[in-house]
Amino acid sequence: MINKVLHGDCLELMKDIPNGSIDMILCDLPYGTTACKWDVIIAFDKLWQQYERIIKDNGAIVLTASEPFASYLRTSNIKIYKYDWIWEKERPTNALLANKQVLKYHEMICVFYKKQSVFNPILREREEKNKRNNKARPFTSNGYVNNVPNSQGMNQTGMNDFIKPKSILKFNMERGLHPTQKPVPLFEYLIKTYTNEGDLVLDNCAGSGTTGIACINTNRNYILIEKEQKYFDIINERIGNQTS
């Protein structure tokens, strides 16, 4: 089942996934906000029954959302809900309503877990460092980054020159394959944050297969489930092109 794309109802197909075998669930669930026939909210009780069974105790369940769906989602399992990220887009998704309401430039990403999840913070250099064109490199065992040559070979930049992740993530939108398509770099960021290489990620509403592509790009394994034949075919073609 690993690195497979499954076609069918996710509530049924997830029953075949072994208990505690998934390191991360990353899914763009249907929000129930469009006229698309597939955009029907999945019964939360049945969804959480499977999610909590198959996720590891320290596995993160990371779900994109938009209001009012986001509020329904959080309260559907408030006991393991932890916090949100905000995905800030480069353009609004409700421009036609600009004369009636504020322009909407964001979606939520809700994070759930039973016990402290894997968390690999992706550090960013402070703005002043970026202005000097110093690029960050991986930390050494003593907590420093080697980046600029000096008389001894390398100059060490300390952790104070870096900023821990903020709750607002800025990624450009991607379009053309699915009405609610998410950007691959955004999902790569989330996957790298909540898993390690070789871990197994489930997306039970795979859409255009963004999670699968992000897993391939970051050396993670995946299980993708998609109910609609059209998008099931798109996923297989997309992954085939990525791995050929």
Regions found by a protein language model. Give the residues of each.
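Conserved Class I SAM-dependent methyltransferase catalytic core
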Residues: 40-94, 107, 111-112
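A short beta-strand submotif of the Rossmann-like class I SAM-dependent methyltransferase core
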Residues: 7, 27
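Small/polar loops that bind or transfer phosphate-bearing groups
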Residues: 6, 64-65, 227
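Extreme N-terminal starter segment of soluble prokaryotic enzymes
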Residues: 1-5
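Short strand-turn motif at the edge of the Rossmann-like AdoMet-binding core
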Residues: 29-30, 65-67, 205
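Class I S-adenosyl-L-methionine
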Residues: 17-19, 26, 36, 76-244
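Conserved SAM/SAH-binding loop
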Residues: 8-12
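Mobile active-site "lid"/loop adjacent to the S-adenosyl-L-methionine
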Residues: 29-46, 169
